[in-house]
Amino acid sequence: MQIFKPASGHTHSTVQKSVVNKLNFYYGGYQALKNIDMMVYEKQVTALIGPSGCGKSTFLRCFNRMHDLYPRNHYEGEIILHPDNANILSPEVDPIEVRMRISMVFQKPNPFPKSIFENVAYGLRIRGVKRRSILEERVENALRNAALWEEVKDRLGDLAFNLSGGQQQRLCIARALATDPEILLFDEPTSALDPIATASIEELISDLRNKVTILIVTHNMQQAARVSDYTAYMYMGELIEFGATDTIFIKPKNKQTEDYITGRFG
């Protein structure tokens, strides 16, 4: 039974960008993720869905080592990042280096108390880019990729807080894109936005899939169906089902997945 119309017009890729092997994650003594195996495909959008507290955001934050900020958290298993086959969860891998390769956009817009230009240039400066001409080129390119350039090109010196909520979120996306990440993580990026701004962000995500691999956490199943190529359904820290979005939404293999998607459970 077809409940939602999945995204169309984009070719599914089976080129692996990342492989998750037997991933377990613990908040102190509490196990939040249980033995997860999953593929992440290159230049595709993968949506993570499931009820509140199922582990979606916890899983997402493993990819850029956000959990390292709290000392009692710990991982087991691997997240392999191609093409160099590096296990990014290894203690020998610097989490700062991981975050240079894997950027994140959060639930609520979080611009820095700086100008529009300096918000986007911030990560570039940290990475050692100093020449003004290069900064200007990279900032413009990031703002164009975030579909924001035409709206802000004449006021790059204005404070980012003067932008609307939707513009601030696109600015955060531009900031994440400026350092050319290999993977872009979205944690419910439209939950704090109105329907018009939400539609703009969804269109942007669809456009970005041609440039970068994307993982998105969303509680909105219609959104997952609209923007994603692959979908993972999670429940109580376990990955219940993973596959092409059209398969998950039209003909899921697992009864629990079907019950969640059709609203009988969740």
Curated annotation (Swiss-Prot):
<dbReference type="InterPro" id="IPR027417">
    <property type="entry name" value="P-loop_NTPase"/>
</dbReference>
<comment type="similarity">
    <text>Belongs to the ABC transporter superfamily. Phosphate importer (TC 3.A.1.7) family.</text>
</comment>
<keyword id="KW-0997">Cell inner membrane</keyword>
<keyword id="KW-0067">ATP-binding</keyword>
<dbReference type="GO" id="GO:0005886">
    <property type="term" value="C:plasma membrane"/>
</dbReference>
<dbReference type="GO" id="GO:0035435">
    <property type="term" value="P:phosphate ion transmembrane transport"/>
</dbReference>
<dbReference type="Pfam" id="PF00005">
    <property type="entry name" value="ABC_tran"/>
</dbReference>
<keyword id="KW-0547">Nucleotide-binding</keyword>
<dbReference type="GO" id="GO:0005524">
    <property type="term" value="F:ATP binding"/>
</dbReference>
<keyword id="KW-1003">Cell membrane</keyword>
<dbReference type="InterPro" id="IPR003593">
    <property type="entry name" value="AAA+_ATPase"/>
</dbReference>
<protein>
    <recommendedName>
        <fullName>Phosphate import ATP-binding protein PstB</fullName>
        <ecNumber>7.3.2.1</ecNumber>
    </recommendedName>
</protein>
<dbReference type="GO" id="GO:0015415">
    <property type="term" value="F:ATPase-coupled phosphate ion transmembrane transporter activity"/>
</dbReference>
<dbReference type="InterPro" id="IPR003439">
    <property type="entry name" value="ABC_transporter-like_ATP-bd"/>
</dbReference>
<keyword id="KW-1278">Translocase</keyword>
<feature type="binding site">
    <location>
        <begin position="50"/>
        <end position="57"/>
    </location>
    <ligand>
        <name>ATP</name>
    </ligand>
</feature>
<dbReference type="GO" id="GO:0016887">
    <property type="term" value="F:ATP hydrolysis activity"/>
</dbReference>
<keyword id="KW-0813">Transport</keyword>
<keyword id="KW-0472">Membrane</keyword>
<comment type="function">
    <text>Part of the ABC transporter complex PstSACB involved in phosphate import. Responsible for energy coupling to the transport system.</text>
</comment>
<keyword id="KW-0592">Phosphate transport</keyword>
<dbReference type="InterPro" id="IPR005670">
    <property type="entry name" value="PstB-like"/>
</dbReference>
<feature type="domain" description="ABC transporter">
    <location>
        <begin position="15"/>
        <end position="261"/>
    </location>
</feature>
<dbReference type="InterPro" id="IPR017871">
    <property type="entry name" value="ABC_transporter-like_CS"/>
</dbReference>
<comment type="subunit">
    <text>The complex is composed of two ATP-binding proteins (PstB), two transmembrane proteins (PstC and PstA) and a solute-binding protein (PstS).</text>
</comment>
